[in-house]
Amino acid sequence: MPSVARGWWPRRAAAVLAALLLAALAACGDPASGREDVAPAGGQPEPRQGGGAAAAGPAGALAAYVERVKRAQAARAVAARKWGLKLTPLAAPPPPTAAEKPKITFRKGFGVGDPTLPPVFTTVPTKERIVFLTIDDGAEKDPELVRMMDELDIPYSAFLSDYLIREDYGYFKKMQRTGVALHNHTLNHRYMPALSYAEQKREICGQQDVIEKRYGTRPPLFRPPYGNYNGDTLRAARSCGVKAVPLWAAEAFPDHMEWREWDRDLHPGDIILTHFRGREDWKGSMADMIRYVMNVVTAKGYAVAKLEDYV
């Protein structure tokens, strides 16, 4: 879905027109499911019909934005049918402005005694019905995944380990060109708590250097292998520019989900983990995994948003 700068009109002005948006997007239909009520998760604003490009000020900007949303959702419905999804993925609400971004803090019980270190969290604090999709390591390099996600316009973030991606850095460059942010999953995917501070720093900061050299950006996010870390892990990560450490609330496979919480369900802001894997490791392909997780997410009334817009 196209991103739109949000600084030029207040979010509360959008809320005033939310009901009109729902009606407009309902007209788009849902070719993948046969339903007629396709609306964005969390509700999105819609101007009066017939305002046209001549409308000025916030209402005009809103009209242009919603028109783009409608076109994107119609294209997503076509892609959903092509890729075999049962339901058309919902459109995420507009991202927050920089001033509106939620404050990320340590999940309760996940701290290491120093609240100034990069926070470890599994869920982004939000009331929107959105979740975030993240893919780890880089073992499987399926070109179908890049095409599928680009055509479906579903955002995701990749957490990469150099020992797996070095055989084909170009694959992840193609992914990056579609808008995917590439983050740090260490050089060699070692168990961090068993390493000294110096060894952990080499693993984490070395991967920061690799990603910056190969892809032009120094990642602000880091995920430790297996989700295991200690105080040295976070101190080492902070020393080379890491701002936050997203773990996960659920994990996706081609045929099932695994859950962190007792209720075995999604919640607003949950981070979903999956891996770059194929039929050698899974009962299915990367595309099968995306079909499964997106059908679950959409059926539960959630949209996938871009993690970097909120963290």
List where the protein language model places each region.
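C-terminal domain-boundary segment and adjacent tail
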Residues: 117-125, 166, 282-311
